[in-house]
């Protein structure tokens, strides 16, 4: 048996080693040097890579309740696997992608909260209910860039979530009530008694939801998709000395959902702990940051089969226990040397998980039991130099080396009544080494104009979920594939940024990505019939398996603009064009097809009007082009346009009230279409009243 705790050992060594260094370091402050070793991109610097920023005030003004909905409305390249909001969507469909680069349940984007990964250790998705907007100070979205400083999970980009700083003693409460029995309440309290500060954030959310099947197709078995969640986040900071600080954080959350019928539910519980030690070296104009974390997840999900008339529902799959755990850490050194900002470091992450599920319903009980899972380890070293050749020219160059391992992979199936073993597969351990890099240039020929370009490579090893766990949506089944190979990216982009004045900004970015061995859900059978793998597929159902597609080429163009017409009125717009096409595949029918779940055109726009100091009116519009539901491009999801609005009144310096309306026009959004034509839909009009008070 392979050592299952390598990352914990690495993290412990890094953390306590850095603690010793910090304790022995000189504490005399020579000068204040603002250098951060957390790998967070500086949006104000002359970086050659794309960055979108959503600050605390923009989060507060947004008409949307959920963070993913806010980002979807403000960043045209942000999307989840499906069009549904995370408010009621199944967690396994909440994988994040940027620039529509191969949406999947696992996602190809790394999401970090204060430098700690939020991606599920087993499946790669992000459960967005664990990061309510009220707990976040800012969001930085960095599409593209390849492996960059972060490696495996950052193939399509990185999203940085930053918690509110512990600056002063304060407390606030926030609550909202809306249609469809939707309620939300949160409490935030911070105590600052230097050199120590501590904070607690607690949030509770509940919605009665809405029916997820198109109105003319619903039957007696259909009911509302519901959601209930809660979160408690505790963190503390200790300023050990003028140059040394320690941050501790612990989080626990629960999420329970009904998926639209009586027999389909899922639940998630999770807990995270982390520690971050930071020490500044003023004489060297440098900073060392060491972090360590542990994560645990427990997931359960049930699936059913429904007859054509939607009058009878039958249990189909019970994933009754899906545990997953992760541990990791990093050590990052950053320093300024003349015209160079240098970042050096290493990180590691260990993940283990398995699925325990009952399947093959015989009319009374599930006949069979399946167990499947495994473990992964990633360890990487990276270096990057940002070189300011002049006030107008910046070059960024870096590389990253990663070592990865897959081990203890297995799949076992037994007859529950007799205990007889039907399948007992042990998958070969695998290892690999990856070397990636990126190079970027930014030039300002004039004060108003900036030009930038970048090339980069990246990779992604399939998640444990993709390798070992099947899933079901209605009568459609997707099988796992333990033989999946890692994906590899070669990408590049060029951009023009024009700031005509302090009140007008326009940027455009053209990009081209080549993804080899892209993991995709490939159709291998149509029901009714019995298939291997997959078993029996009912009429109207489709069997897919996760497989590597040889080559996907994804050209695209992204544009953003901001215009402050007058101090009280501002406009914002964004546009994304993408055309991700399968160029080579083992299955001839896939060649020339667009990737599923990728609209070619997405437009976002917003307007804010502040007629007085107390009143704020905001409106946002989003258009998404048609997209294909399946890999065969045979099922089309219709285009849609949504409008969200908000009216806020600040009745004092401490308090405000807001009316928010999402999907003002009550647009029917097609989120899924099965082989037999059954259409799933997104949320209808959502109206809520929110009150916030600073105590």
Question: Residue ranges of each PLM-predicted region?
Answer:
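Periplasmic-side early beta-strands and strand-to-turn transitions of outer-membrane beta-barrels
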Residues: 147-148, 160, 167-176, 188-268
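Flexible loop and strand-edge segments within Gram-negative outer membrane beta-barrel domains
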Residues: 207-213, 223-229, 243-288, 296-324, ...
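Gram-negative outer-membrane beta-barrel transporters
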Residues: 388-391, 395, 403, 507, ...
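Surface-exposed extracellular loop regions of Gram-negative outer-membrane beta-barrel proteins
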Residues: 254, 298-300, 352-361, 405-419, ...
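N-terminal periplasmic accessory domains that precede
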Residues: 67-70, 74, 94-100, 112-114, ...
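Outer membrane beta-barrel strand-and-loop segments of large Gram-negative receptors
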Residues: 225, 233, 320-333, 370, ...
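Short acidic/polar hinge/loop motifs at secondary-structure boundaries
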Residues: 116-143, 224
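Structural signature of Gram-negative outer-membrane beta-barrels, strongest in the C-terminal barrel
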Residues: 241, 293, 339-343, 347, ...
């Amino acid at each position: 048996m392979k050592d299952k705790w390598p990352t914990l050992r690495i993290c412990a060594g890094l953390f306590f080693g850095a603690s010793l260094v910090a304790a022995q370091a000189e504490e005399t402050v020579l000068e204040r040097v603002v250098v951060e070793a957390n790998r967070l991109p500086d949006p104000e610097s002359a970086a050659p890579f794309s960055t979108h920023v959503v600050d605390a005030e923009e989060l507060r003004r947004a008409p949307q309740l959920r963070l993913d909905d806010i980002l979807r409305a403000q960043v045209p390249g942000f999307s989840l696997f499906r069009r549904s909001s995370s408010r009621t969507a199944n967690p396994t469909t909440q994988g994040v992608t940027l620039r529509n680069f191969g949406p999947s349940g696992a996602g190809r984007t790394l999401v970090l909260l204060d430098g700690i990964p939020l991606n599920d250790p087993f499946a790669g998705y992000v459960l967005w209910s664990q990061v309510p907007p009220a707990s976040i100070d800012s969001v930085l979205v960095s599409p593209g860039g390849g492996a960059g400083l972060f490696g495996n999970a950052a193939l399509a980009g990185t999203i940085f979530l930053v918690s509110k700083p512990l600056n002063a003693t304060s407390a606030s409460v926030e609550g909202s009530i809306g249609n469809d029995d939707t309620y939300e309440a949160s409490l935030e309290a911070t105590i600052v008694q230097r050199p120590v500060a501590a904070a607690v954030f607690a949030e509770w959310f509940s919605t009665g939801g809405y029916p997820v099947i198109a109105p003319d197709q619903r039957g007696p078995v259909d009911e509302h998709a519901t959601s209930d969640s809660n979160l408690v986040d505790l963190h503390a900071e200790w300023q050990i000395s003028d140059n040394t600080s320690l941050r501790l954080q612990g989080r626990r959350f629960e999420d329970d959902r009904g998926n639209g019928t009586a027999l389909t539910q899922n639940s998630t519980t999770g807990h995270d702990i982390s520690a971050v030690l930071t020490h500044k070296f003023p004489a060297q104009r440098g900073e060392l940051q060491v972090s360590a974390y542990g994560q645990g997840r427990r997931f359960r999900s049930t699936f059913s089969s429904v007859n054509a008339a939607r009058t009878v529902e039958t249990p189909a799959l019970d994933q009754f226990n899906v545990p997953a755990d992760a541990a990791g850490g990093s050590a990052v050194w950053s320093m300024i040397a003349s015209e160079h900002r240098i970042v050096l470091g290493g990180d590691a992450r260990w993940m283990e998980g398995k699925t325990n599920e009952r399947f093959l319903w015989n009319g009374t009980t599930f006949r069979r039991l399946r167990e499947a899972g495994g473990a992964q380890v990633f360890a990487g070293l990276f270096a990057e130099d940002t070189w300011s050749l002049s006030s107008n020219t910046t070059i960024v160059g870096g590389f990253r080396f990663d070592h990865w391992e897959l081990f203890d992979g297995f799949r076992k199936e037994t007859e529950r009544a007799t205990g007889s073993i039907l399948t007992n597969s042990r998958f070969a351990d695998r290892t690999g080494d990856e070397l990636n890099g990126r190079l970027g240039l930014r030039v300002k020929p004039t004060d108003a104009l900036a030009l930038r370009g970048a090339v980069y490579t990246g990779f992604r090893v399939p998640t444990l979920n993709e390798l070992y766990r099947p899933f079901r949506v209605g009568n459609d089944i997707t099988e796992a594939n333990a033989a999946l190979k890692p994906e590899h990216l070669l990408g590049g982009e060029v951009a023009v940024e024009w700031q005509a004045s302090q009140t007008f900004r326009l940027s455009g970015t053209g990009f081209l990505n080549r993804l080899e061995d892209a993991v995709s859900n490939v159709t291998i059978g149509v029901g009714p019939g019995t298939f291997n793998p997959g078993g029996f597929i009912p009429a109207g159902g489709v069997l897919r398996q996760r497989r590597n597609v040889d080559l996907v080429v994804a050209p695209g163009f992204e544009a953003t603009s901001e215009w402050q017409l007058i101090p009280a009125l501002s406009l914002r717009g964004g546009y994304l064009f993408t055309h991700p096409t399968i160029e080579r595949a083992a299955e001839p029918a896939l060649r020339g097809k667009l990737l599923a779940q990728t609209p070619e055109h997405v437009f976002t726009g917003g307007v804010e009007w502040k007629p007085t100091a107390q009143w704020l009116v905001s409106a946002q519009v989003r258009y998404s082009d048609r997209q294909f539901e399946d890999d065969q491009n045979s099922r089309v999801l219709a285009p849609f346009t949504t409008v969200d609005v908000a009216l806020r009144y600040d009745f004092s310096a401490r308090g405000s009230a807001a009316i928010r309306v999402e999907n003002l026009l009550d647009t029917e959004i097609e989120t899924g279409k099965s082989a037999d034509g059954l259409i799933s839909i997104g949320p209808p009009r959502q109206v809520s009243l929110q009150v916030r008070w600073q105590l």
